[in-house]
Amino acid sequence: MSLVGKNRAIFNYKNQKLLNRNFLYKDFEKTKSYRTNFSNSKFGSTSFRAAHFKYCSFLNCSFADCDFIGTNFRGSYFSTTTFENCIFSSVVFDQVKFKNTSFKNCYFFGSSAHIQALLSDMDENTVLPAPPAQNTVSPALKEVIDSLRTNDIIRRSHTLHGKGESINTATLLMLHSIYTDEQLITLLPLIP
């Protein structure tokens, strides 16, 4: 969910030590953190959409079910860090150092050569040049997803909807690894 009208400063950190923290179900959308130490922290079901984490340290951290869309990790350091069931799209990894970092069942769209080389021996991840095209969504599923635009929370979370009238096909690709089109057509309208 976007932080429109909310205080983004609560998740903006500069030169801080945030050790052993649990950032579960947090929204770091459009926040800015610089030179911050997040060692031994857990990030679960967290959104990092358009967030900046420049020159931050992530030692012994775990990221589960997170989305990194347009996130900037320039100069950050990841050591003994695990990423599981995460989506990476248009993420900046300039000058990032990875040491003993593992990715499991992650989706990468538009990844740099640096990340592709890192993932070369990890075959349980999906690496694509771009998210699937909009026309790959079946008309019946598109109709169900469009009907959910009336739900303000779902629409602002960008989980199913992109900018304008587009559909977030990256999330749909992840959902299709678990559910069929028919199951999604049946289950998505049940979201409150």
Each language-model region and where it sits:
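Tandem repeat scaffolds
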Residues: 1-143
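Short amphipathic alpha-helical segments
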Residues: 1-4, 188-192
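Charged/polar low-complexity intrinsically disordered segments, enriched in acidic residues
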Residues: 133-190
